[in-house]
Swiss-Prot record:
It catalyses: L-seryl-[protein] + ATP = 3-O-(5'-adenylyl)-L-seryl-[protein] + diphosphate; L-threonyl-[protein] + ATP = 3-O-(5'-adenylyl)-L-threonyl-[protein] + diphosphate; L-tyrosyl-[protein] + ATP = O-(5'-adenylyl)-L-tyrosyl-[protein] + diphosphate; L-histidyl-[protein] + UTP = N(tele)-(5'-uridylyl)-L-histidyl-[protein] + diphosphate. Its EC number is 2.7.7.-, 2.7.7.108. The lineage of its organism: Bacteria, Pseudomonadati, Pseudomonadota, Alphaproteobacteria, Hyphomicrobiales. One of its GO terms (molecular function) is magnesium ion binding. It comes from the Bacteria. Its cofactor is Mg(2+); Mn(2+). This is Protein nucleotidyltransferase YdiU.
Length: 487
């Protein structure tokens, strides 16, 4: 069924702990991503839903799997925790996909592990459905992210603040190695393990680094560059991760661990949704700086590999961090130019962009809908865009400046509009719609809203009558102000 080709399981014992999933009571398949299964070359065509539920709940361990929980540490909200690890997730193993890429297959909510820290190792149904929707939405938006392979209703109750139905989520990732994985060994001054891990990550994710003068510096630079690109993509769609701890940053460059994540409704640069982020550390506009901070923590782990001389190693690491700080504003500006349909660079572009963002903030304009309507305004239909703002005169002044700026580029209005419509989504996984589908599933056992939203987010740039409801911002009574981690 799965042709496992495991490598992480064969690293030294201190990298992980072998552990079997704990069976659940009555597994029932909620969703299975057959397109992804084909990409992973899984032989599942002849398996019915009951068999799939048994496998992807952990009740049946596939042949060739070497189940394990990974060891890692991490800075959580700025405070270092020397041992975290997979407390409710078990890596079944790795497969080679249709494109020759190595991919992890991991169960989340599959029972306790040696890293559970008194937890039950289980997942409530709500977080399972949230991660399935958001990870697939990110994929459809073209943003690197872990993928959803399966969601299973466990038949067990899990105790949180109240008793809730349990679920098991199957996650597919380029790998599950985190900044915190390096920190786990650095905290123990285990330079041998750090070198082994770095060599493994180079082989798996950054093979070009092997041919450079300083492969470990190239590794650090490669991770920093991917994170810089990733966070810029987040910002372009109003994504707020919510818990950017170092143990939630994947060195592969994929978005991972969706816990209390959310998307902007009305634009506010300091927006926070996560109930556990009381100080706003991981607010929308703070994400680039936090990413750089996390890379600095990774650099600290790699210092012994960068150069034998401490001062020289620090100099090399600081140069990477300086490059991140210089590169991100340019990536952000490039992304915003694209959202405004601008194909060239002019000195006044930043001021033009900031004038729009200021208008949006003052009117509490919806982030996604504003840029979608501006995309239509590029082809002459400006009234819906103007209707987003309290300050109509300000909106008109922006439109005049924007049209003058765009007019200097020599492409047609229809071409510009088409380009903008291809990058400014009509549909994101709206926070209130996610809460609705979770409530329907948890309270009523109704998974139709989940499947309907899953269909809608698969085509985020299409406007159709059947997905119109998913394009709409929340009404005042539908707004979500807080999201929860679910652990």
């Amino acid at each position: 069924m799965m042709k496992f080709d495991n490598s992480y399981a064969h690293l030294p014992e201190r990298f992980s702990a072998a552990v079997l999933p704990t069976p659940v009571k009555a597994p029932r398949l909620i969703a299975f991503n057959r397109t992804l299964a084909e990409e992973l070359l899984l032989d599942v065509a002849d398996l019915d839903d009951d068999r799939l539920a048994a496998i992807f709940s952990g009740n049946v361990v596939p042949q060739g799997a070497e189940p394990l929980a990974m060891a890692y540490a991490g800075h959580q909200f700025g405070g270092f925790v020397p041992q975290l690890g997979d407390g409710r997730a078990i890596l079944l193993g790795e497969v080679i996909d249709v494109n020759g890429r190595r991919r992890d297959i991991q169960l989340k909510g599959s029972g306790p592990t040696p890293f559970s820290r008194r937890g039950d190792g289980r997942a409530a149904l709500g977080p399972v459905l949230r991660e399935y929707i958001v990870s697939e939405a990110m994929f459809a938006l073209g943003i690197p992210a872990t993928r959803a392979l399966a969601a299973v209703l466990s038949g067990d109750r899990v105790q949180r603040e109240v008793g809730l139905p349990g679920g098991v989520f199957t996650r597919v990732a380029a790998s599950h190695i985190r900044v915190g994985t390096f920190q786990f060994f650095a905290a123990r001054e285990d330079d041998e393990a750090i070198r082994s891990l770095a060599d493994y990550v180079i082989d798996r994710h950054y093979p070009d680094a092997k041919n450079t003068e300083n492969p470990y510096l190239a590794l650090l630079r490669g991770i920093a560059e991917r994170q810089c690109a990733l966070i810029a993509r987040w910002m372009m769609v109003g994504f707020i991760h919510g818990v950017m701890n170092t143990d939630n940053m994947a060195v592969s460059g994929e978005t991972i661990d969706f816990g209390p994540c959310a998307f902007l409704d009305e634009y506010h640069p300091n927006k926070v949704f996560s109930s556990i982020d009381a100080q706003g550390r991981y607010a929308y506009n703070n994400q680039p700086g936090i990413a750089q901070w996390n890379i600095a923590r990774l650099a600290e782990c790699l210092l012994p590999l960068l150069d034998p001389e401490v001062e020289k190693a620090a100099e090399l690491a600081n140069a990477v961090l300086a490059d991140f700080a210089a590169a991100f504003p340019q990536r952000w500006l490039t992304g915003m130019r694209e959202k405004l349909g601008l194909t060239t660079e002019e000195e006044g572009d930043m001021d033009l962009i900031q004038s729009l963002l200021s208008l949006m903030q003052a009117s509490e304009a919806d982030f996604t809908l504003t840029f979608r309507r501006l995309s239509h305004a590029a082809n002459g239909d400006a009234e819906p865009f103007r209707g987003m703002f309290i300050d109509i005169a300000g909106a008109d002044a922006f439109l005049t400046r924007w049209r003058e700026r765009a007019g200097r580029e020599g492409i047609s209005d229809s071409e510009r509009s088409a380009a903008m419509l291809s990058i400014n989504p009509a549909i994101i996984p709206r926070n209130h719609r996610i809460e609705e589908l979770i409530e329907a599933a948890v309270e009523d056992g109704d998974f139709e809203p989940f499947h309907a939203m899953l269909t809608a987010i698969a085509t985020p740039f299409e406007e159709r009558p059947d997905n119109f409801v998913y394009m709409q911002p929340p009404m005042s009574h539908e707004r979500v102000f807080r999201t929860f981690c679910g652990t």
